[in-house]
Amino acid sequence: MAAAALRDPAQGCVTFEDVTIYFSQEEWVLLDEAQRLLYCDVMLENFALIASLGLISFRSHIVSQLEMGKEPWVPDSVDMTSAMARGAYGRPGSDFCHGTEGKDLPSEHNVSVEGVAQDRSPEATLCPQKTCPCDICGLRLKDILHLAEHQTTHPRQKPFVCEAYVKGSEFSANLPRKQVQQNVHNPIRTEEGQASPVKTCRDHTSDQLSTCREGGKDFVATAGFLQCEVTPSDGEPHEATEGVVDFHIALRHNKCCESGDAFNNKSTLVQHQRIHSRERPYECSKCGIFFTYAADLTQHQKVHNRGKPYECCECGKFFSQHSSLVKHRRVHTGESPHVCGDCGKFFSRSSNLIQHKRVHTGEKPYECSDCGKFFSQRSNLIHHKRVHTGRSAHECSECGKSFNCNSSLIKHWRVHTGERPYKCNECGKFFSHIASLIQHQIVHTGERPHGCGECGKAFSRSSDLMKHQRVHTGERPYECNECGKLFSQSSSLNSHRRLHTGERPYQCSECGKFFNQSSSLNNHRRLHTGERPYECSECGKTFRQRSNLRQHLKVHKPDRPYECSECGKAFNQRPTLIRHQKIHIRERSMENVLLPCSQHTPEISSENRPYQGAVNYKLKLVHPSTHPGEVP
């Protein structure tokens, strides 16, 4: 009766198929890495537990796939209910498992493990509470599964020994194995009185072992690796069936080089190796604690999510209020219901709109209590306060400069690496910061939201407006320590300081000439390349510098703003007026130098000389060689 209960699942005995979960290929793709690893661990643990009870008569397709490191999904075309009912799926020789025609094999319901199902009742399948002692250290464990896992902590011991069947051969993951496969098409039959190579160790020991259907030897199945070793009676390996998974080779390939433990799939080996390397790749974003396994991180994050019943279906983030979840969903949908009335920009949250409006109003409500500096955002004030407290945990390894936050260090690091990850889709120009790209894109849109209240001139950047306003106020906050000269911009002061130091950091790669400003180097390079990027829209003439183009444009304009105060003549360029005024200066100087003759007066004559279209006047003294009545 007890043997029948073990053989017949209908009478309450659990089979591996009863606790197996199947996924299609589409469903398997939807699982993340942590969920896949958890599924593999659970399936292998279930198989090991049922195998330890002697209820496994063949290796499941799912377990075979996991042992080979393959994805354990099943085709959508397979009807798992009918396949499991007739015992077809996963059976050795079945179409689904090996792709060959099924042979006449004993079914799962009428095959019993020799030496297991005959002398054991369901009550005897599990050990009583902590009544399974370890024969190495004497520790008592509650069942055979925990005992098998515990015995792996004795890597140099050899606990699995079959003294009657294989003398001196010990079942250990640290020993080399003799892999033998039984030909499932020709089951081995023994005559009466002869030793069977597939006979189990149940005849020789009372340990709860299971039969290896490939090598014919008993093994202990644990929740991570299975161990098996066999030496057949005839000393010769049997022919392996084509397509049968060589479980022993999988164990040999997935062996830990540190402890010698062998695993039936590579993912389990990778997880095991983290014990030796102490690697903890999974970090909690809330508290920064690291974990070895993704499942442990998922379990830990539930501590932070207590009191947050609202979960985002897109990213799995939890929120304590439904309104916060609604606002968060706009990140995935791209919805931006809040619009700025000044520039028309949209925002997903009202708080972001309030912060943006301070750009137009210039409001800075957050004041630093140490230096009195104001900020438009609270986060900027918090970062600024670290300057006074001296908290600069992030230091650049290249130049030693310290930063208050890691993001600032990352931005600074691009100065050394030259990285420019942000590209403008309009002109293809690259930038090192996203803020620089946003400001640059205004050049293409032509937007100038920042207007000067004095002259009405508009600018695309607020910083440019602040610099321009110093023209009206006359403010020059930057002073040179050497000569005391004042400047309205810090860049002008830096360029001026190089006059005192003689520093010329910008070198031309073509001729080796040095310059004290980058703009001067750029203008100089155009001499080598012949580039003339500035073109006159009137006549098409090109220039190397923008200032030369501005001067040229005055030729086409009718206005002549520069007028001579002596003769009233007007000019379109100031240098031309200065050259013209030198004519009047020479005229006055000649009148003072030449002594007037009593009979003749100095006469001023002019002659045209085509020097760039200008008229040069030459002072001549027209005087005869002798006066009338004089003797030469």
Curated annotation (Swiss-Prot):
Phosphoserine PTM positions: 196
One of the record's GO cellular component terms: nucleus
UniProt keyword terms in alphabetical order: DNA-binding, Metal-binding, Nucleus, Phosphoprotein, Repeat, Transcription, Transcription regulation, Zinc, Zinc-finger
Protein name: Zinc finger protein 792
Protein location: Nucleus
Family listed: Belongs to the krueppel C2H2-type zinc-finger protein family.
Superkingdom of the organism of origin: Eukaryota
Main subcellular localisation: nucleus
Recorded GO MF terms: DNA-binding transcription factor activity, RNA polymerase II-specific; identical protein binding; RNA polymerase II cis-regulatory region sequence-specific DNA binding; zinc ion binding
Organism of this sequence: Homo sapiens
Function: May be involved in transcriptional regulation.
BP terms from Gene Ontology: regulation of transcription by RNA polymerase II
UniProt KW Calcium keyword: no
Name of one Pfam family that matches: zf-C2H2
Zinc finger (C2H2-type): 132-154, 254-276, 282-304, 310-332, 338-360, 366-388, 394-416, 422-444, 450-472, 478-500, 506-528, 534-556, 562-584
PANTHER family, A to Z: ZINC FINGER PROTEIN 200, ZINC FINGER PROTEIN 551
